Amino acid sequence: ANLRAIHSELKTAREKAPQGVLGFNIMVATKEYASYVKEAVKAGADIIISGAGLPVSLPELVEGAKTKIAPIVSTAKSAMVICKMWDRKYKRIPDLLVIEGPLAGGHLGFSREDLSRYGADTKDVPHTYHQDLYDEEIRGIMKVVKQFEEKYQKHIPVAIAGGIYTREDVEHAMELGADAVQV
């Protein structure tokens, strides 16, 4: 049923936004990850964004298709692991990199200790969050991106997700080097 839904949902989205870039956010942690990715490609998805684990096999699953791929990372270490692995094994880099910070919802790549260190584990996050600490992590991720951009002579767009509520939040993300935000 889920595989059939991929086709019908994409068709509905194309009818509503024929010029839009349409894709799926597919969690690595799902039991049928490879099947979902392959079906999304078959359905004509423009992009697959993938997290809830490192999407190490994503390039292989979309090989030969026009579908773009975007891993979700939360640390410079995870960005380096995925970029190095894709470079070594598939001779490619992400078409887009999504950075999900500790304020993003969903399946985050943070331990409870990390969330506590960033002040993102309280009932009063707007007053306890240490943005400057996570900004340093984002800068580290951007250095990884730059390294692979230089190697491939190709820009890797970066979208920052989590904690984006206001115009000032968007401007701050852009100051950190993001090309886009995900809300």
Sequence positions of predicted segments:
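Short acidic/glycine-rich loop or secondary-structure boundary segments that cap or lie
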Residues: 106-107, 167-169
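Short glycine/serine/threonine/alanine-rich loop segments
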Residues: 67, 156, 178
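Glycine-rich beta-strand-to-loop/alpha-helix junction loops that act as flexible
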Residues: 157-165
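Active-site entrance/lid segments in N-terminal catalytic domains of soluble metabolic enzymes
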Residues: 1-148, 152
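Core active-site phosphate/anionic-ligand binding loop and the adjoining beta-turn-alpha structural block
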Residues: 104, 165, 175
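Structured core elements
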Residues: 98, 159-160, 182
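Short, glycine/acidic-rich beta->alpha junctions
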Residues: 53-54, 165-166, 182
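A compact, surface-exposed functional segment
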Residues: 171-183
